[in-house]
Amino acid sequence: MSENHKLSYVRNIGIGAHIDAGKTTTTERILYYTGVSYSIGEVHDGTTVMDYMKQERDRGITIQSAATTCHWIKKDDCAEQASQKEQEYKINIIDTPGHVDFTIEVGRALRVLDGMIAVFDGVAGVEPQSETVWRQADKYAVPRICFVNKMDRMGADFFRCVQMMKDRLGTKPLVIQLPIGIEDTFKGVIDLVKMKAIVWSNEDLGAKYEYHSIPNNMQAMVEDYRHQLLETVVEVDEEIFNSYVSNEDLSEEDIRKCIRKGAISGLFVPVLCGSAFKNKGVQTLLDAVVDYLPSPNDVNSIKAVDVKTEQEISRKVSVDEQFSALAFKVINDPFVGSLTFIRIYSGKLQTGSTVINTTKNQKERISRMLLMHANNRKDIKEAVAGDIVALTGLKSTTTGDTICSLDSQIILEKIEFPKPVIELAVEPKTPADQEKISAALVKLAAEDPSLVFTVDSETNQMVIKGMGELHLEIIIDRMKEEFKVEANVGAPRVAYRETITQSYTVDYTHKKQTGGAGQFARVKIIFEPLEAGAGFQFESKIVGGAIPKEFIPGVEKGLEEIKESGVVAGYPTIDFKATLIDGSFHEVDSSVLAFEIAAKNAFKEGITKAGPKLLGPIMKVEVISPNEYMGDIIGDLNSRSGVIQSMEPRGNTQIINAYVPLGQMFGYVSTLRSLSQGRAQYSMVFSHYEQVSRSIAEKIQAKDKK
């Protein structure tokens, strides 16, 4: 079998969902049934394989995305083909966090994966972080299958969950399984492709399951959903569609072919159900992974930029192409040092070879290559297109960098990282810890690009910035546990932003004469507002040599640096465009540095007169509460400047959706616990930036002046 043909038996998948929907439990069952683990790890016992960090086991949540490889042979194939090695599917899995503070782990995993299992809580349905993960998967056009988990739990409702997928995610769910029984009577599923009931044994941890006839009391419902399934899937294949409208019977193979085609193209999303904790539905989920999620061969080609020509090109995902890979994660391993995880898109990589990091134009030698299983590792000598492996000892490569062969240099599309929304002041407990803290934060920031730390040049105060209170709490904890350094921590602060509301043109001349060579640069720049989320854009419209070409990068660099300290309260300025339209230079006194300084001063003058405003992060908050506490909870949200969007009944509880400024949400968990006697729960995700009120802006400015 050729190497490229073998790729059709590879699946690179992620498992993602809202916190507590059962992602890690589902992954642990997959590892057990595929033979990777000999016992089932449980989140509540702290015995999971994939959650191996101390902080993960202490809190019962996933913090880092953990990678593992397993192999699966479909039950249908076992009798005839178990002895044929090529029928064994290799599944590379990344289990990702569900907590909003660790969204970056989901984003960078999806960037390098070919497919995803979206796990939903059968009771709660589509939750806020489910929506965030879904949007991230949409961004990278990752095909998905859905697994409605916890069907054994009180209040589980498969059909309501499917409807929520339509309403909240805007997707087209394709039901391919129906649950048999509800809550504590749940015992299996109806397979709408095979048209058989599948029932799991309770005696052997769900390792065995049997096919039965469809129960009589479900016949009508099954026929209805089977009809909907066929009506939807035949649309993707003209030949099969013609057979269907001619009333010819469709084979299971025909139906699977159509489902696969539609799922990979994103026309619909297959939906399955089960209970991972009760060991029901996981094997059929694995069958769906190999049946309906893409192999690396289905990706066809990837977009890249040719280093020599600077032109966009396509490179085929093939072992026969030159080597290229994307680094998507760096971690510090206590035994082997720095580990760089890569996804190989084309060609082969062997230990001992030399490659180039085209992002940084630095050569790297591959001294050791590892196949990872959570925090365990296996040395390998070669990896090929489609593989996800870890490399040790890379000197220059960080998250988002491209590495490739020396003979054919390309740069792959980078990974985008979210901007921090919260910050903490940290200081060493002893003067001797100052350098230790800096060294620890450098290593932690290399692992986690959503962590930013800065040192104030005047006060020498260190500030760490991240995605939420839990995110920064984990960072402080890891500094103590892994780097043996403790810090005093200040109160959390909101990471505000600044923007402008009108256009302004500034003509600024920088002139300095101190004897000998002087400095001269004149720039004329238009500053104008952009739509939310547009970031910063720079354009040069210089013609006729008013400013020599070699000085223009100095203008852009000056603006890039100065925009990080806005004119309102010193926060980064976002969502604006700077257009360089004119200027002048001096043959002797002009330099890149002079134009850099001129641009910075032009920014200060121009932004000040362009209607600068302060922006604060707005969070999308979902509160689930028993009915009797609704009045107090809504009153409290209103007092926090919250805007109630909707209230939705669910049994004896209400779901409140609201937008609330992040600055008003500190300490909310204890307030909610007090208001509801510990019975309500909430989750929040970042939504957007919004102009803060004048009173809050004045308070922030007053603090900034102190």
From Swiss-Prot:
Print the keywords alphabetically: Cytoplasm, Elongation factor, GTP-binding, Nucleotide-binding, Protein biosynthesis
Q: Name one GO cellular component term.
A: cytoplasm
* Positions with a binding annotation for GTP: 17-24, 95-99, 149-152
Compartments (UniProt record): Cytoplasm
Would you say which domain of life the source belongs to?
Answer: Bacteria
User: Do you know which InterPro entries this protein is assigned to?
Assistant: EF-G-like_DII, EFG_II, EFG_III, EFG_III/V, EFG_IV, EFG_V, EFG_V-like, G_TR_CS
| Protein's UniProt name | Elongation factor G
Organism of provenance: Orientia tsutsugamushi (strain Ikeda) (Rickettsia tsutsugamushi)
